[in-house]
Amino acid sequence: MDEVLSFKRGRVPLLISMPHPGTRLTPAVDAGLVEEARALTDTDWHIPRLYDFAEELGASTLAAHYSRYVVDLNRPSDDKPLYSTATTGLYPDTLFDGRPLYREGMAPSAEERMRYLAEVWTPYHRTIAEELARLKAEFGYALLWDAHSIRSHVPHLFDGRLPDFNLGTNAGASCDPALAARLEAVCAAAEGYSHVLNGRFKGGHITRHYGQPEQHVHAVQLELAQCTYMDEQAPFAYRADLAEATRAVIRELLESLLAWGRERYA
């Protein structure tokens, strides 16, 4: 398969993971998609662009190239459900709105999907694990920020309009509570934006698996409402007029994350 990810090593103890901005499809997935799925509506559009200041902060960055329709990097390899409510699995068969992803009988075979696990999912998670280990060895701790976005209205997944900033810490298990409180305070002070901590999106597999505060690895997921930086309808254009202020809040969140780490591990 083609190159499956982009990784850039930084100089501070922070890794920003971007598992869902990819738009590449495998031939088997491409051949089977229903017409309405071809717009790749459920993509976390423009996330690398939204976070392109990460290099200035010194953060390491990791971004996936393949679409979540191929394999969802934020699900466990055994596909154990993460939420009791409606969700999508390791190998999605439905769109976020509940409609089928594939034409009847056209989903990739089990053998094909095992290849996606080996060639797309595994390298991404190997990179996370290796980089967190490197950061912890160098600094004594590591910080993981899992960057996501989603349409602000998806009735099949949640009621009403999603808050703008959705912080997830696996109900407090993936990071120090003092860190979560500091990040929530940043969101609360961000004029014109709504937020929630551990609401509908508490953190997917990446946050839950790698966040081990007792081992000095602190993980936080941000699920961002896409209306804060882009058009939510095709062709899903990036809106610099909206994104500028949103990026400023994200940057403040990441700077606060780094500052907390310096203070906690001084």
Swiss-Prot record:
Domain of life of the native organism: Bacteria
EC annotation from Swiss-Prot or TrEMBL: 3.5.1.68
Molecular-function annotations in GO: N-formylglutamate deformylase activity
Record's catalysed reaction(s): N-formyl-L-glutamate + H2O = formate + L-glutamate
Family annotation (InterPro entries): HutG_amidohyd, N-FG_amidohydro
Keyword Hydrolase applies: yes
Pathway recorded for this protein: Amino-acid degradation; L-histidine degradation into L-glutamate; L-glutamate from N-formimidoyl-L-glutamate (deiminase route): step 2/2
Enzyme class: hydrolase
UniProt entry keywords in alphabetical sequence: Histidine metabolism, Hydrolase
Gene Ontology annotations of biological process type: L-histidine catabolic process; L-histidine catabolic process to glutamate and formamide; L-histidine catabolic process to glutamate and formate
Family according to the record: Belongs to the N-formylglutamate deformylase family.
Other information: There appear to be two competing pathways for the degradation of N-formimino-L-glutamate in P.aeruginosa: the two-step degradation of N-formimino-L-glutamate to ammonia, formate and L-glutamate (via HutF and HutG), and the direct hydrolysis of the formimino functional group of N-formimino-L-glutamate to produce formamide and L-glutamate (via PA3175).
Role summary: Catalyzes the hydrolysis of N-formyl-L-glutamate to formate and L-glutamate. Shows weak activity with N-formyl-L-glutamine.
NCBIfam families reported in the protein's UniProt record: hutG_amidohyd
Subunit architecture: Monomer.
Identification of the protein by name: N-formylglutamate deformylase
Gene of this entry: hutG
